[in-house]
Amino acid sequence: MALSTDKSSKPYVRYLPFVPNGEVNIPPSKSDVHRAIICAALTRGKCTIAPVALSNDIKATIGVIEDMGCTASIKDGVLTVDGTNIFKTDNVTLDCGESGSALRFFIPVAAAGGINATFVGHGKLPERPIGIFTEALPKAGVKCETEGGLPLKISGRLESGTFEIPGNVSSQFITGLLLALPLVEGDSDIVLTSPIESVGYINMTIHTMAQFGVEIETTDNGWHIKGGQSYIPHDYTTDGDWSQAAFFMVAGALGGKVTVNGVNRNSAQGDRKIAELLAQFGAKVTQTDTSVTVEKAELNAIDIDASQIPDLVPVLTVCAAFAKGTTGIYNAERLRIKECDRLTATAKLINDLGGKVTELPDGLVIEGIDTLKADSVRALMTTEL
């Protein structure tokens, strides 16, 4: 593999044929770090979070808490957050970069703090849907001003109440409300109006909040949130990132033998299901409490319900391209409204390499083949949880 910086084109990566073998130490989960940073800021005290890797999305989250009055510093992978002065600023611009997570987490959090804020973003973020909030928050004391998307101006203070939310929208909306509603006076309920998808990310939120002393009660059709709770300062240890581990695990299934280290078998991350799915494909999977080893074996097609694991769809499609038979991936329509249409982008990438992928409205159908061809492809996707 080589990285080119030819001035006549954008940087690109050149891959040469090889059989992947070896061990990989997985970096911390970006999804986990996002949530921990916000919880730490809301303690109004001093916390550490470790290990932390500074991706652009995490930098955006740190920037937002700083603009809301917190201080943050990082050294040797340990992030220190001091939330003493959170919400003591007003009329602030909160730049969420290209992070949908930061945007949808912080809108209700800022509203719970009663600050006047203008949310801005870059790339495709200004076009990402926020209608769930612009419809629900004005009913709960928050004025929202937007011409559709960003910039979004909010003012007023979030009030308790009942929030009816479709279950098939991004779980980021629900996470934002879960983080914010314990801060307001009075109890609240989030009521699902349709079956929940990506529940793993919501469970991760609830798990992280519990580490900081905040309780969420799961009900038959949503969640009950007690008001007037306080986030308690806590030194937080992050999980390894199952989403990133998935790519190396699939490489093992297709190539030789790959071990990923630093992944928690009992993690709240829904993407830990990758180990189970690769075993269903036929790969040899061996798991301990903190590692997974995947070895090549004959792969056979399976059907995959992606409603709870949409971010695994691209890498699962790669695996399916080499599995005998026809694999179907369903219930992933939300991938069409990410930073790009991930279903179309994934299908195009595999087909450009000689694969056979057909798009469905909510997924992909992949016919397995023996090998893909060498070619140039354009990367359109970023991961964002």
Predicted regions and their residues:
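Structural preference for solvent-exposed beta-strand-turn elements
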Residues: 2-385
